[in-house]
Amino acid sequence: MKNCVLKGVLALSLASSFALAEGGFAGVEGGYDFNSKLTGGLKDNRPNIGIKGGYDFDIARVYGGYFYHAKAKDSHGSIVDAKWTNHKFVVGGEYTPTITEDWKLIAGLYTGLSTINFNAYNNKGAVIEMYDVTKVGWLLGAKVGGEYSFDKNNALEFGLKTDKTWYPSAYNLDFKSTDVGAYLGYTYKF
């Protein structure tokens, strides 16, 4: 946990240094994963929230951020009462061409680290195993959407994003997760 907090503080300080420059931005984002899947058939819907900051070059931008994905629950086959949450630390780049005076297209890629906390029971008849796993994995994602600027400093961003994470194996479980969802965010431009 200390390691996650340290990485979060480092990412925020990096984002803050970008935000102090001309063209810098900071923002908050909320979303809903309408398809959050783990290897083995486990899936659920769940909300997420995050913060980000970076530098806007007008036609493109770079950013760093932290996103928390709330608890998901499911049972599948012999795995019962599975619950998982994610903490995602990402860096990304986006192409942001102007469509009209107030509208921009957003298309980008991001990568980073994702921490999963997974708890479940495996019911094998007479034997019940309990899993309590925390793993850090590499994620790769993409997003597409739009941005509407109210004025030179305030903007509303919305769209769809998806990412896939590969975690190290634990307890003979090969962890991979995929999240697909919609997001809505507010950005303040300096």
What are these regions (language model features)?
Residues 1-25:
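Cleavable N-terminal export/targeting peptides
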Residues 24, 145, 157, 185-187:
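Outer membrane beta-barrel transmembrane domains
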Residues 24-40:
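Short N-terminal segments immediately surrounding and downstream of signal-peptide cleavage
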Residues 32-34, 68-70, 162-165:
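Generic short beta-strand segments
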Residues 51-126, 138, 148-150, 182-190:
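Gram-negative (and chloroplast) outer-membrane scaffold detector with strong preference
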Residues 119-174:
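A charged, solvent-exposed segment within the mature domains of Sec-exported extracytoplasmic proteins
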